[in-house]
Amino acid sequence: MSKVTFKITLTSDPRLPYKVLSVPESTPFTAVLKFAAEEFKVPAATSAIITNDGIGINPAQTAGNVFLKHGSELRIIPRDRVGGRGLYLSP
């Protein structure tokens, strides 16, 4: 069975730490998301993985499909950084 390797960067940390993960192609991408979130100590249930171009990745596919569609360099963002609704106070 072939493996795919991802370099996943935590974008919410100014130091931009990253982890390199190698998983079998058939691994559900939800498992990759969960493992990466645990490695960075962020909540998996409220995190998203995006491409370097900012395109969100649907985790309901295999790691092999994600690798073929989006490549190996990805970013994980915790929910508090996703969509970022700010509070606007009018003067």
From Swiss-Prot:
GO BP annotations of the record are: protein K69-linked ufmylation; protein ufmylation; response to endoplasmic reticulum stress; reticulophagy
Gene3D superfamilies recorded: Phosphatidylinositol 3-kinase Catalytic Subunit, Chain A, domain 1
Mind telling me which InterPro entries this protein's record contains? Ubiquitin-like_domsf, UFM1
Proregion positions: 84-91
Position(s) of the covalent cross-link Glycyl lysine isopeptide (Lys-Gly) (interchain with G-Cter in UFM1)? K69
> Where this protein primarily resides, as one coarse class?
nucleus
Q: Can you locate the Glycyl lysine isopeptide (Gly-Lys) (interchain with K-? in acceptor proteins) cross-link?
A: G83
Q: Which family does it belong to?
A: Belongs to the UFM1 family.
Q: What is this protein called?
A: Ubiquitin-fold modifier 1
The record lists the organism as Osmerus mordax (Rainbow smelt)
Q: Which gene encodes it?
A: ufm1
